[in-house]
């Protein structure tokens, strides 16, 4: 083989000898001086690294070629380095998990974590036409592909550094453990229901009644929420009726609402949006009070509406022996409003809604905007502590100092206590709606927390984006005890179709796997469905219906998967595969070859080495062996060393000869029979006996 001296290669590449020596050391190639010789393999790698135009072309070409199916990755075997430790070896079908942080997505750092020389990785990929540099940054996808070739599966873990947002959250968790500090907090109420059933009219009636009792004059502006007093106790209403906003808030981890008022018109009954609103509230696990509205209308039927509540939603009224509070009202005339408010206070008392009454405030942003006159504005509902003018605040990646507070009447106030909705002037930028607001001790702390939150958001977006569960992931997830439920939202073109789907899906369930239909409905997939899917980590299934343009945009932003089908058998087939993906894989023992010990070599300080003639199949160092003598099994264990002549190898096929050292076993004799086997994990399948027809 031709040899090239270091200085000769440096001259060829038009770089200094020192630069080349540094490059070689980075690749893990040790050289003593400019006169050191390099073999052709190393020369080719270095030349390849410096041929930038070829590199660009090869990388572009490799982008498609290096994408392998999971099966190909599992079947690929990389030769184990001679000195690789036993615990690093990969058993067929088993993946070793390597936990790394986002900052460790670099080739040299990844190689170090895998305990594989970076020069070997560079060389292995160079032979495939892929040029890698030791210090180059890697995308998560590329890092996973490289790791898989050496028997590893990557898991990205949070960097071990103080998270100031988490610290603020834990601070309140600790305070809540001391029940002696807690007091009753005014409930926050959201009104939901079908369009035209009177949600806005109800909110207006409650608001106007409260104002009339106190003073002349209306509210000068809407800040997104208001509060009323009933028998000396406060109730806060979010003045943005609609379950989309409610669920969007929950999808972002903010639970502002304590109680939901479900409005149902007595002359119309339970409608599709009523079902939708109920499912949103049920998913959030908040108490529901039903307000049967429009009882003043001639064709109103309270009893018929109660019947529909029980049959369609499972909400059985208290006077029917159930546990759902149902209040007949007329938002138009005011009838029943006082009773409804009293029921809200009763439910709040039973729910034991608590807060920390003093100290630094915490709240939830429910509205935000940029005002040309005063700059960023944000409406917050205070959940804990006292918010005052002059406080330093942070909400997500935004921060500031409270310059002014305004109540729902537009009046400036000095402070806000738990349950109060107030508008804040003083943020550096418009904060995200539904962000958690914290009061901190200084402007520097506020800046630090906001900067950390911003950086965290960037890293999360860079790593994986905002993405919820996907159906195909369930098809291969397997083995995760904590994941045995598949959440679905079903939309179809007719009631008959959706009912047929629900019945068919129910037959797919077993003791091990479960499908939870979070919501079902008729018609186009809309933005409300997407927000519910985001909140409940569900997949949306459309049967003979499609998403509207807003839903498609929203799904892309939220990372929610929408699957649309025209044939019910295709839908059921995908669900079967998804459910099978939830099952623990089955480990099987597979015999892959046989051999016979023809010679035994006794080596001092090493032990007995078997000279083996392979009779059929193959032997792999990562597998196992059973040894039989006179048809009796005398050993079943691992292979410590596998050699072909003097070379350590990972696999040998019949009819070749090889040398084998058995792990912790030396009692071998000529004529012993060997049976080689491997352990594989195989996907389990479910035997479904459902019968379904296309609706």
UniProtKB/Swiss-Prot annotation:
Organism: Kosmotoga olearia (strain ATCC BAA-1733 / DSM 21960 / TBF 19.5.1)
Gene name of the encoded protein: infB
Cellular localization per UniProt: Cytoplasm
Major localization class: cytoplasm
Protein name: Translation initiation factor IF-2
GO molecular function: GTP binding; GTPase activity; translation initiation factor activity
Region (G3) location: 239-242
UniProt keyword Nucleotide-binding, yes or no: yes
Entry keyword annotation includes Zinc: no
Region (G1), start-end ranges: 193-200
Start and end residues of each stretch annotated as G2: 218-222
Region ranges (Disordered): 60-92
Family: Belongs to the TRAFAC class translation factor GTPase superfamily. Classic translation factor GTPase family. IF-2 subfamily.
InterPro entries, per the entry: EF-G-like_DII (IPR053905), IF2_II (IPR044145), IF2_N (IPR006847), P-loop_NTPase (IPR027417), Small_GTP-bd (IPR005225), T_Tr_GTP-bd_dom (IPR000795), TF_IF2_bacterial-like (IPR000178), TIF_IF2 (IPR015760)
Annotated region (G4), positions in chain: 293-296
Superkingdom field: Bacteria
Domain tr-type G positions: 184-358
Function text: One of the essential components for the initiation of protein synthesis. Protects formylmethionyl-tRNA from spontaneous hydrolysis and promotes its binding to the 30S ribosomal subunits. Also involved in the hydrolysis of GTP during the formation of the 70S ribosomal complex.
Pfam families linked: EF-G_D2 (PF22042), GTP_EFTU (PF00009), IF-2 (PF11987), IF2_N (PF04760)
């Amino acid at each position: 083989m031709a040899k090239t001296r270091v200085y000769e290669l440096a001259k060829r590449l038009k770089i200094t000898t020192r630069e080349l020596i540094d490059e070689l050391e980075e690749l893990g190639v040790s050289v003593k001086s400019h006169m050191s010789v390099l073999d052709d393999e190393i020369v080719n790698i270095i030349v390849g690294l410096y041929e930038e135009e070829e590199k660009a072309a090869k990388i572009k070409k490799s982008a498609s070629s290096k994408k392998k199916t999971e099966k190909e990755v599992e079947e690929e075997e990389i030769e184990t380095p001679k000195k690789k430790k036993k615990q690093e070896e990969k058993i067929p079908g088993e993946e070793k998990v390597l936990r790394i942080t986002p900052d460790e997505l670099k080739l040299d750092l990844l190689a170090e974590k895998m305990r594989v020389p970076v020069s070997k990785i560079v060389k292995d990929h160079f032979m495939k036409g892929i040029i890698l540099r030791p210090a180059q940054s890697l995308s998560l996808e590329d890092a996973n592909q490289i790791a898989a070739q050496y028997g590893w599966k990557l898991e990205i873990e949070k960097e071990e550094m103080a998270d100031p947002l988490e610290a603020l959250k834990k601070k309140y968790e600790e305070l809540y453990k001391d029940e002696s500090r807690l007091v009753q907090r005014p409930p926050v109420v959201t009104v939901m229901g079908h369009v035209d059933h009177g949600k806005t009219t109800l909110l207006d009636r409650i608001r106007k009644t409260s104002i009339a009792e106190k003073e002349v004059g209306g509210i000068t502006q809407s800040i997104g929420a208001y509060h009323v007093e009933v028998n000396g106790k406060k109730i806060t209403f979010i003045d943005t009726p609609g379950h989309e906003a409610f669920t969007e808030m929950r999808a972002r981890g903010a639970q502002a609402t304590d109680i939901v008022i479900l409005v149902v018109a007595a002359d119309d009954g339970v409608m599709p949006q009523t079902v939708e609103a109920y499912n949103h509230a049920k998913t959030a696990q908040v108490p529901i009070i039903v307000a049967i509205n429009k009882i003043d209308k001639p064709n109103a039927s309270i009893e018929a509406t109660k019947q529909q509540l029980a049959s369609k939603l499972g909400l059985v009224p208290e006077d029917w022996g159930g546990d759902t509070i149902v209040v007949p009202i007329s938002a138009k005339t005011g009838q029943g409003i006082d009773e409804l408010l009293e029921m809200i206070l009763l439910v709040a008392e039973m729910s034991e809604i608590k807060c920390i009454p003093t100290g630094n405030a915490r709240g939830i942003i429910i509205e935000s905007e940029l005002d040309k006159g005063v700059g960023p504005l944000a409406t917050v509902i205070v959940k804990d502590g006292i918010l005052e003018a002059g406080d330093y605040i942070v909400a997500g990646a935004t921060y500031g100092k409270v310059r002014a507070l305004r109540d729902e009447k537009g009046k400036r106030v000095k402070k806000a206590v738990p349950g109060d909705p107030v508008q804040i002037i003083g943020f550096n930028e418009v904060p995200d709606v539904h962000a958690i607001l914290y009061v901190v001790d200084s402007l520097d702390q506020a800046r630090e927390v906001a900067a950390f939150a911003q950086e965290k958001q960037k890293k999360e977006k860079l790593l994986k984006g905002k993405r919820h569960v996907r159906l195909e992931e369930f098809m291969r997830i397997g083995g995760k005890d904590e994941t045995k439920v598949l959440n679905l939202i079903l939309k179809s073109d007719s009631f008959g179709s959706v009912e047929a789907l629900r019945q068919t899906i129910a037959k797919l369930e077993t003791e091990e796997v479960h499908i939870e239909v979070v919501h079902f409905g008729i018609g186009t997939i809309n933005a409300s469905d997407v927000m519910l899917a985001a909140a409940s980590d569900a997949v949306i299934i459309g049967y003979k219906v499609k998403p509207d343009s807003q839903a498609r945009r929203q799904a892309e932003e939220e990372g929610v998967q929408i699957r649309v089908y025209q044939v019910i058998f295709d839908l059921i087939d995908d669900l079967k595969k998804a459910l099978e993906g939830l099952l623990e894989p089955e480990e099987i023992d597979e015999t892959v070859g046989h051999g016979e010990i023809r010679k035994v070599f006794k080596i001092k300080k090493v032990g007995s080495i078997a000279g083996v003639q392979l009779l059929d199949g193959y032997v792999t160092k990562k597998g196992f062996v059973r040894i039989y003598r006179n048809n009796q099994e005398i050993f079943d264990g691992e292979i410590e060393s596998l050699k072909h002549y003097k070379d350590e190898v990972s696999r040998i096929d019949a009819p070749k000869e090889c040398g084998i050292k058995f792990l912790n076993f030396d009692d071998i004799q000529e004529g012993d029979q060997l049976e080689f086997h491997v352990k594989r994990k195989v996907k389990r399948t479910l035997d479904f006996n459902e019968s379904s027809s296309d609706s």
